[in-house]
A protein has these predicted regions:
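Residue-level structural signal for beta-strand termini and adjacent loop
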Residues: 39-40, 57-58, 100
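Short, flexible helix/strand-to-coil boundary loops that buttress conserved ligand/catalytic motifs
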Residues: 38, 48, 66, 98-99
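Acidic loop->beta-strand submotif enriched in PP2C/PPM serine/threonine phosphatases
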Residues: 16-24, 28, 53-96, 128
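C-terminal catalytic subdomain
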Residues: 3-4, 9-10, 23, 77-87, ...
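Catalytic core of PPM/PP2C metal-dependent serine/threonine phosphatase domains
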Residues: 1-49, 71, 123-129, 136-137
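Amphipathic coiled-coil signal-relay and dimerization helices
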Residues: 34-38, 53-56, 145-146
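Short, glycine- and charge-enriched coil/turn segments that flank and shape catalytic ligand pockets
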Residues: 30-31, 48-52, 105-113
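Residue-level detector of flexible, active-site-proximal loop/helix-junction positions
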Residues: 43, 51, 59, 141
C-alpha cells in the first residue's frame, strides 16, 4: 500500500534523476513469516541455519516502474536466530558478494550492530566510493520479564 502511495510522486522525473530505490522488510513476529520488497535495490541476505541466501529483486527503481503492481514481494520464513541483511549499493556492488556472505556467516554470533559496522568497513577497504548503509536484523525470542 505504501508503494502505491509514493510511486506516482517519484514518476515525476527530475532531470538527471535515475530513480529511487526501495528496500523493505516486514516480519510477523508471532509466525516468523516475512516479506521483502526490492525495487532497484542492492541484494539483501538471509542467514539461516542452512547458510546464507542472496535475495535480489528484478523490479526497476520507483519512478521508472510503469505500475506499483510490477513490484513482486519475496516471501520468507524467519526463525529464532536468523539474520536479515540489507545493504545500499555503496556497500554491495552486486558483482561479487562472496565477501558479504563470508562476513555474515563468520560473524553470525556478533551483534547486528557489529556485523553492520564490519560490512561497511570491509566495503571501505574494497574501495567503495558511494554512500554506505548496512542494516542487520536478528529475529530473537522474547526474553521473559524477571
Amino acid at each position: 500500500d505504501a508503494l502505491r502511495t509514493v510511486a506516482p510522486a517519484f514518476r515525476m522525473r527530475v532531470e538527471g534523476m535515475r530513480g529511487v530505490t526501495l528496500d523493505a522488510l516486514t516480519i510477523d513476529l508471532y509466525t516468523g513469516k516475512a516479506s521483502c520488497l526490492k525495487c532497484g535495490a542492492a541484494p539483501s541476505y538471509l542467514k539461516t541455519g542452512g547458510g546464507v541466501t542472496t535475495l535480489a529483486g528484478e523490479t526497476l527503481p520507483i519512478g521508472l516502474m510503469q505500475s506499483p503492481e510490477e513490484a513482486e514481494p519475496i516471501p520468507l520464513r524467519m526463525l529464532h536466530g536468523d539474520l536479515f541483511v540489507m545493504l545500499s549499493d555503496g556497500v554491495s556492488d552486486g558483482a561479487d558478494d562472496g565477501w558479504v556472505q563470508k562476513i555474515v556467516t563468520e560473524r553470525a554470533g556478533d551483534s547486528p550492530k557489529d556485523i553492520a559496522a564490519r560490512l561497511v568497513a570491509a566495503a571501505e577497504k574494497r574501495g567503495a566510493s558511494d554512500d554506505m548503509t548496512a542494516l542487520v536484523v536478528r529475529l530473537e525470542r522474547r526474553k521473559p520479564a524477571v
